[in-house]
Each structure stands twice: as structure tokens, then as C-alpha cells.
């Protein structure tokens, strides 16, 4: 399925049904009193977060959504039925905003969470409601109240405990493939990952956490360069970030400058995102050139108070220690096998 994480929706709640003008007409009763019923309430527009949904694709194909109108009242004091609510199911993690003002209206972060965003119009009162001692035969009724309309912006932010961050081809997809059942495309060229993917990572004692892989970040990403800028928002809910650094290209490229460039892009995109806990991971430890440069790189980070975790997704070396560090940061302790 194509991954769609943003969509604009034009939604309308239902108009209320009209009240009825009617009078009793029975044998031997020539001039019966008013008995027009009330109109029914219009349907609401309701959003529900549903586990199992992973994209807003279906809503992109149906941008105009309208709840049912309330039914009109009838004679003999019969009230109109309420219009059916329009229930729109969205992935967990969907944020709904007013497309015009940008105001956030709802953040559906839990499975089953529901919110009524647009209320249906009230039904109009029938003429039976307006009879009085001085006005016994009212020949008017209320129209139904109009429903509400809104232009909404829906934005999906993936729900993950751990987010992967780094340049294109830094080894993010290889890592998530190694430790989870996720199968993103992997190749030896930039931007093989063109959409976010989630993987459930099993840990010790049947515990697990969710990891998100997004396209690599390049310089200028906060201004729209590359692919990663579109997907940085998917890291905003992550508890911690793994910043993957590939040092195998030294000296052709400077991995330390690249690390600082990615950190800069993160800060310019969102200072709050940049302030999240980060774990620095040196990838491709199975390559000889990585091992040759590791001590130099480790020293640079340690001088800045940053511990690094060298790993190889190909052989699994260092991966267990990295998972223990993730567990310690997520849950405050490392699990022991039993």
C-alpha cells in the first residue's frame, strides 16, 4: 500500500431535520390541534484511532466527507430520526488540525480513542411545540439547524519508542532488518528508503519495543532538500533517537562533519526533537576500514561526553549491547534472561 501521511479533508456534519406543520384530522374532530413532530438531529463527524491502519491513503481518494442529515418531523407528533454519524477511522498517531488557522484540534495517540470534531445541527421544532392558550393553531415550525463545516489537515506521526536518524546509506535499514521483522529495501546507494517503516524489536523476557526507520537526512533538509525532511515528524513521538554514523568512507568524507550536519538539520527542523535523548551508533563494524578508524572516532565523541556503540548489522557484533542500552534508557534497567 502506498504510504500517505498527510491529507486535506473537507468535512461537514449533518443538517438538522425540519420541524413539521400538521394538525389532527380525525372523524368528528373538524379542527384538531397542532401535532407536527420535531426534526431529527444531524449526524456528527467522529474520528476514531484504529490499530492496524498505517496510512491515510483511503482519505486522499475521498476528500469530501459528509454526515447524514436529520430526518424531517411528521404529523401525529412523529419526530424525525437522527442522521447517522460519519465515523472516520484513522491510524493511531494521527494529528488533526484546522487547515486554515493551523490550530491543533485532536491528537489520536491511543487505539480506540475517538473525538467528535463537528456536531450535527439540532432538529427544528414542530408546530405542536408552539401551541399556547393564546395561539392554539400555530402554522409554522422551525427549520433544522445547519451542520458545521471545516477544512481539516490530517497528519500521521508514527508511534515508535525508538527512531533511527542519519544520512542516507548510514545503515538504518540494515539495522532494523537485523533486529526486527521489518523488511525495508536495502541497497548500496542513497535513498533506498523512500517511506518510513516500523519494526517491532523483540527483547528479553518477551519484552519488545517499536523502532521507526525514516529516509536519510541531508544538508538543507529543514528547507525541503532530500526526502528526510518530510518524515522527521515521525521521530517526534520517539522516546530516544539512534543516530547512526558510517565511518567507512573516511577519508573521502568526514563522518564527524556529517554527524554535526545532521544534528544541525534536526535543530533547525525542531529544537524539541533535537533535545531528545540520542544514542550514537557507529555502523558497518564488519568492514576493515571502519575498525581502522574506530579508535579515532570514539575518542572524538568521548571528548564531548558522548559514548558510542559500534555495531555490525551483517554479523550482529555489538547489537546485543546496543539493545541493552536502549532498554536501559526506555525502561530504566537491563533485563536479565530467565
Swiss-Prot record:
Superkingdom, taxonomy of origin: Bacteria
* Enzyme Commission code: 3.6.5.-
One GO cellular component this record assigns the protein to is: cytoplasm
Instruction: Name the cofactor(s) required for activity, per the record.
Output: Mg(2+)
Question: What Pfam family is a match, any one?
Answer: GTP1_OBG
Annotated Obg domain residues: 1-159
- Keywords linked to the UniProt accession: Cytoplasm, GTP-binding, Hydrolase, Magnesium, Metal-binding, Nucleotide-binding
GO MF, one example:
magnesium ion binding
**Gene Ontology terms describing biological process:** ribosome biogenesis
Q: How does it assemble?
A: Monomer.
- Which HAMAP family is this protein grouped with? GTPase_Obg
Name recorded for this polypeptide: GTPase Obg
Q: Which organism is it from?
A: Pelobacter propionicus (strain DSM 2379 / NBRC 103807 / OttBd1)
Gene name? Answer: obg
